[in-house]
Amino acid sequence: MFLCFCTAPILCLWINSGGAVVVSNESLVVCEPVSYPYSLQVLRSFSQRVNLRTKRAVTTDAWSFAYQISTSSLNVNGWYVNFTSPLGWSYPNGKLFGIVLGSDAMMRASVSTFTYDVISYVGQRPNLDCQINDLANGGLESRYSTVRVDNCGNYPCHGGGKPGCSIGHPYMANGVRTRVLLTTQSPGIQYEIYSGQDYAVYQITPYTQYTVTMPSGTSGYCQQTPLYVECGSWTPYRVHAYGCDKATQSCNYTISSDWVVAFKSKASAIILRSQLIVALAQKLSRTVGVNKAVYFWFLKQPYHYLSLVNFSPNYALFSPLCKSLRQQSATYSALSYGSPFFVAQECYNNALYLPDCCLYTLFSILFSWDYQVNYPVNNVLQANETFLQLPTTGYLGQTVSQGRMLNLFKDAIVFLDFYDTKFYRTNDGPGGDIFAVVVKQVPVIAYSAFRIEQQTGYLAVKCNGVIQATLAPHSSRVVLLARHMSMWSIAAANSTTIYCPIYTLTSFVRLDISTSWYFHTLAQPSGPIQQVSMPVLSTGAAGVYMHPMIEHWVTLLAQSSVYQPSMFNMGVNKSVTLTTQLQAYAQVYTAWFLSILYTRLPESRRLTLGAQLTPFIQALLSFKQADIDATDVDTVARYNVLILMWGRKYAAVIYNQLPEWSYPLFKGGVGDSMWFRKKFLVTTKIHQTASHFPFIAGYLDFLDYKYIPKYKDVACPLSTMVPSILQVYETPQLFVIIVQCVSTTYSWYPGLRNPHTIYRSYKLGTICVLVPYSSPTDVYSSFGFFFQSALTIPTVQTTDDILPGCVGFVQDSVFTPCHPSGCPVRNSYDNYIICPGSSASNYTLRNYYRTTTPVTNVPIEEVPLQLEIPTVSLTSYELKQSESVLLQDIEGGIVVDHNTGSIWYPGGQAYDVSFYVSVIIRYAPPKLELPSTLANFTSCLDYICFGNQQCRGEAQTFCTSMDYFEQVFNKSLTSLITALQDLHYVLKLVLPETTLELTEDTRRRRRAVDEFSDTISLLSESFERFMSPASQAYMANMMWWDEAFDGISLPQRTGSILSSAPSLSSISSWHSYSSRTPLISNVKTPKTTFNVKLSMPKLPKASTLSTIGSVLSSGLSIASLGLSIFSIIEDRRVIELTQQQIMALEDQITILAGYTTKNFEEIQSSLNTLGQQVQDFSQTSALSLQQLSNGFEQITQQLDKSIYYVMAVQQYATYMSSLVNQLNELSQAVYKTQDMYITCIHSLQSGVLSPNCITPFQICHLYQVAKNLSSGECQPILSEREISRFYSLPLVTDAMVHNDTYWFSWSIPITCSNILGSVYKVQPGYIVNPHHPTSLQYDVPTHVVTSNAGALIFDEHYCDRYNQVYLCTKSAFDLAEASYLTMLYSNQTDNSSLTFHPAPRPDPCVYLSASALYCYYSDECHQCVIAVGNCTNRTVTYENYTYPIMDPQCRGFDQITISSPIAIGADFTALPSRPPLPLHLSYVNVTFNVTLPNELNWTDLVLDYSFKDKVYEISKNITQLHEQILQVSNWASGWFQRLRDFLYGLIPAWITWLTLGFSLFSILISGVNIILFFEMNGKVKKS
């Protein structure tokens, strides 16, 4: 797409996919887009105003992405760094033109490192030099810099120039004027040479040689002398000078730098993001015809205007505050691990993002330490409640002046652009941190011994009555206070940081915050929604609240159709003249706030939300334009951006001056500029000669310590001595150099190559800290290495909190400079502090120990953080005093709990496996009533990552598997519904009303059929609710997933899932299972006695039998559900038989044979004939169930038209009656399966692996699995607070059956580092009692042995601890309650003793597990629990012997790895069951062998994209299942005919089909084994 819009004859905007360039008739410049992480995605690009000006006219545009150096002396955290050698230039008429590095000189770190060469030929010595001096008015009037390119040869020069030859016009004594271009514009230097009337513009670009030929004919010029210069970016603060020692040969110099000194460009520029092409074209098309170019801010990046603001009073205020924050964070980094100060530390390491993270840090501290962020309970705020609650301190005044409110609006909204909704929370902090914002300056601000007093117009900062600093008041009349421990930061017109101990906490004295926008930022909408606070400017509080739940917030706005956003009640005294104007400001910034939240949402949520927000925002912007004060250009510009963004069609308001945020952020003035340290990444070279540093790029003046050197590379004498780190840190007095150059035997320590050693090193771990050792005798330009013993670090005891005069401390291989007042001495830490030595140039490094207990700060009254998103309560973290909980990046799946030390990190394998398995298990939840506000969640990634982009990549493979699983699951549900509907259709056809005599029994059966029809409809509706929006299934799962971070277990369900009266629970609570209507209520098995009236209905059509065939085919869809259908049909006559009479099918065949003696030969002949027919039919059906139905039709057509058909009707009636019962059983099985899933989830939450999650036969087959568990170090499991904990499974070494009880032996070959030998021996285990009538109906365990339970193995006693009591048995096979022994347990940690006692009897619900991995089955509890024990070495004495106690430090593995190949077969005879009538089941076992590729485990398979393909490949083998079905079906059909022929003459007779069903079971762990069971058995008894 290529578009061109010309809004004026002299301005064309070219738009294509690569960007856009503003082309004027003056020049062409392309700017670099700034990589800014927190910028708005819609307003991401920036542009600059394009001015029409004459050549030589002066522009006032500022750069949008860099920081200026506007003074010759920089303030570095309280001390000053001076620059020397000022350089200026003048006009040809001699008038001073400007001084270098004014407002147009910026410094920034570049993403890339530029390398450029300066080439000198014979007779030339090119010298690039950039110097700095004091600038008038902070350098705001300077326009250009000067780069002098001197000849420095023997050529004659103009008398007006300096020695050597200056390039340029002779009247320009200081050479040519230049500027450095941007990195994306071929970084280089553009310079102009004055030619008498105009300037000739040249450009020198990196990697390109240029020949600059000087004009000839004038005395003093460098006549026709070629000069080759190759240059790019400059190093910080100084373009280093290079020279050749000899002028008789050519030489070149290489400079590498990642810094750019940027000067003023002559023309403005714009780059458009590609994703904004269409929108921009649409918007600009509406402005054609506007003559003035006032739209340059359409796509203004927020970072642009924030970094450029200098008129708004608060910005200069926050700049020194950020510096003070950084100072504190460096000093107290060890103490503030839970606070946001480390963010400030990081931001100072990268100058490019300074405003972002400083304001980010400020708001994080401000809104998470002092104030309580309240979220509405039940979607409403209580009386006298706001989103932002103040501390329990008395504040005065609640009014605000009109004008100040307008200013505060503007100031507040700018910070919002950088406020990120992630926040860090500390309760009481490390030592009680506090932030205070005082808007109205008062005579005294007191906090214990700390005071700020107004004295003669200045602010005197006192501690214990002693003035520590004097600050000038800020123009905004705002003072910012920050306290961390006993360090105070105060920011007004300038800033300072002092140390003032705090012993008691008092209230603020006369602290008036009445005009602070921090606290007056909420407005309430009029209309029906009276109690919902509408955030207008509460950027911190409302931002935290609205970002995660913005959809919920928008629904509140939409509740009232008559809601008028223009009717805000601002809660301030509004004058009549300013009411509408104030209203306009409020609405503009409210719309701006919502727009920022909107643009920060992920795309999927943004699309959904946009339609809801658009009318509301347009309503906000519906006031008259005249209501906006045209002089307030900041609000006008925001208003224009909003109407462009949200589709307003009328023109923007035109204003007559630049908005505030188009000016530089840090303007001139001593102490306002920034200074940044950089860590140098060095390259290493191997030299076998004397070791040394190569040339330093520049020089290091040890007398003044002005500049940070830039090392090109570092060398060590031997290959094994490579200095991997070199760091240079500046303090006010010296440079501290840290070198890491360590070998296995000795270290090299740095000095100089000459005998005069000015630096010596201290060995501290793997680093060497170099500090001045003696006074330098010269200015050195290089360092060298030579072997020298390191100085010892003495340990010094001190009682001082602060060591005055010391310069900094070393911790974790990093040097941190201290405040000028001195270095703090922390308690319980090593304090390696550098202090002045015996002489002025000598410094020492010592380890200081505090010998007195530090002052304990009285903590501020705790303000708890209640994170209550509606209908979800996140309350698992208990915040206590002196503890800190850091919730870091919850959206990304990382939870760090400092209380327990547990970590849930998404990068490990344990995360992946538990992630997948846990979601698989809980993917069949009950129907949930979900809040309507969550109905728009449509993506798996949306739920898991919640907008976190980094998480999306990590969770992609998981969501792919989940999406496929959901497709299969939903398809299976649909197939089940279809099958049930078809069965009902068959019932209607085969049981017509005309064939039944409507007795009470038949009416009851008829009602059963109709009820079955209703049941199908209800089941279908229930499944449709489960399937229809995919979000419901997702949300049901994500409910558990969210709680995995919070440690909240799901509550137990109340009531039975099949009870006639469903349990009542709040449908609005995510935590409660919603009330469900049972699919079949009060189901009674109908009698199968049919009083058949002998009539001659029509023969069932082929379509009917086809429907039956489709029912049979639905078994495959049931397979994916993992259902087991047990059909038990009961006949009235059968009840009268004894169990022995119907125990075995062979007995019935014997009975049948007695009836068929005289007709046996005829039956046999008929069976042979039918058998051949069935065989032919089986061969011709060709795996098609439709052909099977045709076969049924062929057999039916052979029926006799009279008595045979009457019998068939009877049999069909009986068969269909059986189907009714079977479908009732099916519905119960569906619920039973759901209960099993739910119970399994509950068990997992309780740390229990119950039979609902794994069956005994699976344990048997885990032998191959467990063989791959390698022994080694103990591996931890997830924290107690995680919702899902997965224990490793044992090695099953043997299995046997003893007295109808299944026994398993197992061992766990784990060798721990703290235990000698293998932990566990082979122990027998008791799994389940097959004779218990409810052995398949496990419930949630009522008692669970806690995870800290140890286990004892005595000679013949097997013991486990429960509630401080050890329960022991004499033998693992003797679990009778009378055989229990009880040992009392002592709480003593050392030499704990256990004593056996014969009483009391134990709780029957306690299982014996832990280290021996027992499973105790209790009739009272109906549970079987498996757990894995521990391996910490503790002992106990019993009968003069010492036995080990296993403590819960090692609980096995987090995952199970299965090596290839693997084949798991299944035999379900081990499944215990006691149905009302015994079943004799026949099985058709189909086992698939799955071979995994080498080096691939199940974890990789489950989370791999190819997992789908593997499942599809397995599905191809289902053809074999169809063949099995055909064989069984043909056999059943043949037997059906055999029985019908045999029953000729035996009317009436009653046929009961005992079993007709598909029994399908899918092994959850492997996910690929499908076992199909199909059987049809018949019983007959003569009437």
UniProtKB/Swiss-Prot annotation:
The chain crosses the membrane at residues 1554-1574. GO terms for biological process: membrane fusion involved in viral entry into host cell; symbiont entry into host cell; virion attachment to host cell. Glycans are attached at residues 25, 82, 252, 384, 494, 573, 842, 936, 970, 1268, 1299, 1387, 1391, 1430, 1433, 1440, 1485, 1489, 1497, 1517. Residues 21-1553 are virion surface. It comes from the Viruses. Belongs to the torovirinae spike protein family. Homotrimer. This is Spike glycoprotein. It comes from Breda virus 1 (BRV-1). The gene is S.
